[in-house]
Structures are given as structure tokens and as C-alpha cells.
């Protein structure tokens, strides 16, 4: 309890631990929630051990009985205590969603018996596998469980399995996440499984609107900077016309999907135009370069400042184009699988299984057991091109670092240090 209060205080919150110094969900039902909750959402600690079986039994909320008890009269893994609690808290139409250790979907012995009873209620709605590195400092994969006591009658003997382990955005070497649009896509699978096609249709419209707005934003940004390219952006004109025509004539998301390849070419040409401009200016004498800069922008004071300003603005445009391409990529991911909005099992991604099929799999709730292995999807990024870009960028950064070090060394010499 003291640790809990301290944790709340660190986050600037006042707390009252209702169970006092003995606060422990396994041994106390302080809030008396059994059968009272419309919704339950939780991220409990995984794989807790040494839980006293007798105290846990006395605390109740175990509609399917205790998990396995060892010779020391302890529950050696409390995962199915949590799962039982969350189910027990729901009222007759309640819904639950919680994070759980990946191993819990297929654990054996008494866990399997509890899982069997749980599945036979017809209230297990969806199971989702999640990739590694979705938690800070915890690299292990996990699963998301969803219960729904108010499921439609036609879905009661079915469970939706989603394997999202290959679908995520890399934040850095040790952290992954779902982007806003990836979460919407995963939601869309559930909508279609439930027959909520209108939500899917609205999402397609949201994609269309977002891409149109992104286009307007980066096109306006390019318009303001294009004059600064001083004729080096001529190759961009026909591409810009093509892109504009597709956007203006589009009526739905499918008509915008071809933009992805065009925007990739557009970004490449934009970077090439900037490079050509910079190489020309860098090749001039200092005074000539200044005159050249002022001929393009009267407010320019030096070539270096002008180059930095133009480069920064072009990088911003390229970044906006990349963001637009990301939205298009996610729209394509969704529409290629579900078209205008009919649920279908997708190899390696999702599968609706009946309770009979789950029984055949020995009551496993591991999505990968049902969805099978996904086919390898082509990446629209060329590996060799990307590695070349990275190599060039590293060389540029190294060159800039060397110049900076020379400047620092020279300054130290002047200071006599």
C-alpha cells in the first residue's frame, strides 16, 4: 500500500488505499465489483507467483475455480486469477479489454480447464497477439483479450483472432507502437466481424479526407518555396500536374492509392533539385555565391544562410509528403484486404473460429494457431536505394562533423587553450 501511495504521489495524485496496509487484489475485494461493471479495462502484472491459495479462494470472484495450486498451497502463476476477476466483474451486458502475457493463451493444466469454461460461455469476443517491444523496458510480446457478455446471438459461438505481430510502427530500436491509422485499421477488422460496415465506410471517407488535406498542405508549402529553386525544379512540374489531376478527380479512396508511387518520385526529384541548386552555389566564389543567393531572394545575406533556409523548407515539404504517403500506405493495407467492407479471413492476420474449431485446437486462444503464417508482403522501399541514401547521409554528416571539429580546434588555438 505504501508503494502504491508513493507511486501516486510521484504522479502528482492523492490516493486513498481502500484495503489499507493489506491492499492486495488477490486477497481482498475492496470495491465489491462482482457483476457490477459495464466496462473493465486493465493492464495487470504478468506471471505473479506465490499467491496464497486459501486466501484467494476466500476472496471469491472465481467463477471457474482456482488455477493450479502447488505443494506449498500457492498459485504459482496468477494470470488466470486476473482473467477470472475481469470476467466476474462484468454485468449481464458488460465488456472487458485487458493486456495479458502471451503465454496465457495456451497455458496448460488447470489454466486450460478455466479457459475451456470461459470459451464455452460464448463471451470471449476477440484475442489479439501483439509484437515485441510495445512496453518501455519490457521486450516480450503480449496479447489483448476482449470479453463481451452482450455479444450478438449469431457471434456467441465464434471468436475473432487477430495476429498483429507483423503490423506496427518502429519508434526506435527498443520500442514499437501502432500509429493512429494502424489502430483504426485494427478496429476496422473488429467492426466488420461485428457487421458494423457503416464504421468501416466512414473510415474510408476519413482516409480520403486526410490525404486530400495532406496534399493541400504540402502543395501550398511547395508553392511558397518553389521559386527559390531557381529553375532547378523544372522536372517537378509534370509530376505536380499528375498529382493534382488525381486529387481533383478523385471521388473515393481507391482513386487516391496511385498517388503513393507518384509522391515517391516527387520526393526524389525534389531532393535532386535541391542538391543541384546547392552544388551550383557551393561551386561559386563566396561573393559570387552571395550575389547568386540575392538574385533569387533579395533578403538573402549570405549563400550559406540562404542554402540553409531553402534546405530546411524543402525538408519540411518532403516530410509532409512522407506523412501523406504513410496514410496512403495504411489505406491500401486496409482496402486490399477488405475492399468496400466485407469481412473475410486473411491469412496471417485474422480468422473467425467457432467454438468447435477451438476445441479441436485443445482450447488454445493463441491467434497464430488459427490465422496461420502471413505471406511476405512487398515493401515499396528499394533496399539498395535506401542503403545508398543512408550511406550518403552518413558521409555528409561525417564531413560536417569534421568541419565543425576543425572550427572548434581553430578557436581553441586562437584562445591559446
Sequence positions of predicted segments:
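S-adenosyl-L-methionine
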Residues: 2-35
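A conserved structural/catalytic subdomain of Rossmann-like adenosyl-cofactor enzymes
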Residues: 34-413
Amino acid at each position: 500500500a505504501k508503494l502504491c501511495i508513493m507511486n501516486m504521489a510521484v504522479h502528482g495524485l492523492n490516493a486513498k488505499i481502500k484495503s489499507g496496509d493489506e491492499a492486495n487484489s488477490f486477497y481482498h475485494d475492496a470495491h465489491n465489483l462482482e457483476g457490477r461493471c459495464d466496462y473493465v479495462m486493465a493492464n495487470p502484472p504478468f506471471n505473479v507467483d506465490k499467491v496464497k491459495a486459501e486466501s484467494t479462494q476466500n476472496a471469491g470472484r472465481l467463477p471457474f475455480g482456482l488455477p493450479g495450486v502447488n505443494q506449498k498451497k500457492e498459485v504459482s502463476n496468477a494470470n488466470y486469477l486476473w482473467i477470472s476477476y475481469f470476467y466476474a466483474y462484468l454485468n449481464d451486458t458488460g465488456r472487458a479489454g485487458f493486456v495479458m502475457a502471451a503465454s496465457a493463451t495456451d497455458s496448460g493444466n488447470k489454466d486450460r480447464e478455466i479457459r475451456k469454461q470461459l470459451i464455452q460461455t460464448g463471451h470471449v469476443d476477440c484475442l489479439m497477439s501483439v509484437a515485441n517491444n510495445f512496453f518501455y523496458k519490457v521486450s516480450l510480446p503480449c496479447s489483448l483479450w476482449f470479453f463481451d457478455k452482450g455479444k450478438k446471438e449469431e457471434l456467441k459461438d465464434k471468436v475473432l483472432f487477430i495476429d498483429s505481430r507483423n503490423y506496427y510502427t518502429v519508434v526506435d530500436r527498443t520500442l514499437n507502437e501502432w500509429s493512429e491509422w494502424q489502430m483504426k485499421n485494427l478496429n476496422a477488422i473488429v467492426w466488420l466481424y461485428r457487421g458494423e460496415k457503416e464504421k468501416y465506410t466512414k473510415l474510408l471517407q476519413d482516409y480520403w479526407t486526410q490525404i486530400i488535406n495532406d496534399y493541400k498542405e504540402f502543395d501550398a508549402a511547395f508553392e511558397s518555396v518553389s521559386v527559390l529553386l531557381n529553375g532547378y525544379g523544372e522536372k517537378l512540374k509534370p509530376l505536380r500536374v499528375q498529382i493534382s489531376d488525381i486529387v481533383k478527380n478523385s471521388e473515393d479512396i481507391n482513386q487516391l492509392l496511385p498517388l503513393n508511387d507518384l509522391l515517391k518520385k516527387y520526393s526524389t526529384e525534389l531532393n535532386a533539385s535541391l542538391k543541384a541548386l546547392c552544388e551550383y552555389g557551393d561551386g561559386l566564389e563566396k561573393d559570387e555565391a552571395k550575389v547568386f543567393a540575392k538574385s533569387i531572394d533579395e533578403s538573402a545575406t549570405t549563400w550559406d544562410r540562404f542554402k540553409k533556409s531553402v534546405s530546411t523548407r524543402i525538408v519540411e515539404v518532403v516530410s509532409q509528403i512522407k506523412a501523406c504517403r504513410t496514410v496512403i500506405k495504411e489505406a491500401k493495407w486496409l482496402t486490399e484486404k477488405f475492399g468496400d467492407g466485407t469481412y473475410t479471413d486473411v491469412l496471417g492476420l485474422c480468422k473467425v473460429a467457432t467454438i468447435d474449431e477451438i476445441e479441436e485446437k485443445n482450447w488454445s486462444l493463441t491467434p497464430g494457431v488459427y490465422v496461420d503464417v502471413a505471406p511476405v508482403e512487398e515493401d515499396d522501399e528499394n533496399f539498395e536505394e535506401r542503403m545508398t541514401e543512408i550511406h550518403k547521409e552518413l558521409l555528409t554528416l561525417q564531413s560536417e562533423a569534421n568541419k565543425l571539429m576543425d572550427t572548434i580546434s581553430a578557436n581553441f588555438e586562437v584562445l591559446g587553450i
